[in-house]
Regions:
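Active-site-adjacent "subsite" loops/lids of carbohydrate-active enzymes
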Residues: 49, 57-76, 145, 150-200
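Glycine-rich, aromatic-flanked loop segments that form ligand/cofactor-binding clefts
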Residues: 49-53, 90-100, 128-174, 212-214
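Catalytic domains of carbohydrate-active enzymes, especially glycoside hydrolases
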Residues: 76-102
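Polysaccharide-binding and catalytic clefts of secreted carbohydrate-active enzymes
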Residues: 90-91, 98, 139, 167-291, ...
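Conserved aromatic anchor
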Residues: 420-428
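Beta-strand-rich modules
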Residues: 457-474
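Extracellular fibronectin type III
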Residues: 471-483
Length: 483
């Protein structure tokens, strides 16, 4: 008991010291040596990734190979086209690999395309897709495999006979209409065949970045009448109308492709490019784009907005874009532009119209870029379109990330400068995007996208780097380096 007073005195002293410490930490100004403030690192705004793509049409040899059946000439033509796209900072090509119930590769389901050799079923003597995919990737260009899900053959009218049906395609799966031969969309066997074809394609060529459908579903009325009453009787008992039955046949196809891709090929982007008229899509082609987007079946929707920006027209570019932006829900959207209409009366005498459309699209955060129909019109610089795009696309740009399964990317570290070069350290299998701005008040531009970890630079200003994975997901920016 005799030590209690000393204990109380010690406790009181501790409380006084503690209160004094709290007072100093509260910032009363009583500390004669306050800690130095931590310097704020500069930060810069970087642009969002943007799709810059082109459709490369092989049906009727429109864009490739133009009647050139020599493998060496074909390869040179293709790489020349890729070099042009790289020069103008494109980052994706949508190449038509199945234009007419055929294949640009050795398939057990369908014959070699006649558009490679001039003869349906003839082996071209080289692996066309392997070459094309590798050459595109070497130039930093994604390769999306464009497939027509139902079309097998076309003809001008029924006075001309269709060719013999390939033995791999059962006769009972096919409609022969006035102007088109196509798979019957009502048949479960047809849906399964399409799944098998896509799975085979992606298994053979894992480097493919995307699967793409265009706007061909049920046939246009102008292509000929079809009779599916027997199919409706056999498969349609749960539907109140034959229209609902047809719409759901296409829905089932789109849904099953989406599910298969996400299960077996999760890194592959699934996109569809419907026509611009939503009523026509639904009532004539039985393509319910709203339903696809609302259910999240697509990674990207690319409406073909081939109209001019007429502010007074209810069917102009702006009005159609507004509709698709509203009813794409959470599905990313890109715009299909009519490069083939540049210089056409009622569209534009030059490429001004395309620039207007790009400007309108870029103002909407739901739009992630552009794709142009078609490649040959760019090659021909129709109406000066390439000259204009060189101003719209002054530097390279990474693509947006459309994948729903990709994991976060580790940022680059140790960004430094010495002897005229930036260097940095990456983690894992990634590319690097290098950004520059002369002022922190201005949005940065992309200097380069590289698999390396250094870049020669000379301009005074601010630099940062992001890591970019194979799904185009970018990391947070590195520290900002001022030179």
């Amino acid at each position: 008991m005799r030590y209690r007073p000393l204990y109380n005195i010690a406790l009181a002293l501790l409380m006084i010291v503690g209160l004094a410490g709290c007072k100093r930490e509260g910032g009363s100004g009583s500390d004669p040596n306050p800690p130095e403030p931590v310097p704020q690192m500069p930060t810069i705004k970087i642009p969002r990734g943007e799709l810059r793509a082109v459709w490369m049409t092989t049906a009727w040899e429109l864009d490739w190979p133009h009647g050139n059946y020599n493998p060496k000439v074909q390869r040179e033509l293709y790489t020349d086209r890729l070099d042009l796209l790289r020069k103008y900072h494109f980052n994706a090509v949508f190449f038509q690999v199945r234009p007419m119930g055929d294949a640009f590769y050795d398939s057990k389901y369908e014959p070699w395309s006649k558009y490679i050799t001039g003869q349906r079923g003839q082996d071209p003597g080289y692996d066309v897709l392997d070459f094309m995919i590798k050459e595109a990737h070497e130039r930093g260009i994604e390769f999306h495999a464009w497939i027509n899900p139902y079309r097998i053959e076309t003809r001008p009218n029924n006075k001309k006979a269709f060719g013999p049906l390939h033995p791999s395609i059962p006769r009972g799966w096919v409609w022969d209409l006035e102007k088109i031969r196509m798979y019957n969309p009502a048949l479960p066997e047809v849906r399964q065949r399409l799944l098998d074809i896509i799975d085979e394609l992606l298994t053979k060529y894992p480097g493919i970045d995307g699967i793409h459908f265009d706007d061909y579903f049920y046939p246009e009325q102008s292509q000929g009448a079809f009779d599916d009453a027997a199919d409706y009787k056999k498969y349609g008992s749960e539907y109140s109308t034959i229209t609902d039955f047809r719409i759901d046949n296409v829905n089932k196809m789109v849904s099953s492709v989406s599910q298969m891709l996400r299960t077996k090929h999760p890194g592959v982007t699934f996109s569809i490019s419907p026509g611009s008229n939503a009523d026509h899509n639904l009532k004539d082609l039985y393509a319910d784009t709203r339903h696809w987007c609302k259910n999240g079946w697509l990674d990207l929707i690319i409406p073909q907005l081939y109209q001019a920006t007429n502010p007074t027209s209810q069917s102009g570019f702006y009005q159609r874009l507004s509709w698709f932006c509203q009813f794409s829900y959470k599905t990313p959207l890109a715009v299909g532009h009519a490069a083939y209409r540049v210089g056409e009366e009622g569209f534009s005498t030059n490429a001004d119209e395309i620039s207007k459309q790009i400007a309108i699209a870029r103002k909407d955060s739901r739009v992630y870029g552009s794709i142009y129909y078609r490649l040959q019109d760019l090659v021909d610089n129709r109406g000066g379109i390439l000259d204009r795009l060189s101003k719209e696309y002054p530097t390279v740009m990474p693509l947006p990330c459309f994948s729903r399964t990709t994991k976060a990317v580790s940022p680059v570290r140790d960004l430094s400068y010495k002897d005229g070069r930036l260097t940095w350290v990456t983690t894992g299998k990634t590319r690097s995007v290098i950004y520059f701005t002369s002022s922190v008040d201005q949005e940065a531009v992309v200097l380069d996208i590289t698999e390396g970890s250094s870049l020669e630079v000379s301009r005074k200003g601010y630099y940062c780097v992001t890591a970019l994975n194979e799904d185009n997901l970018q990391s947070k920016i590195s520290e900002v380096l001022e030179l």
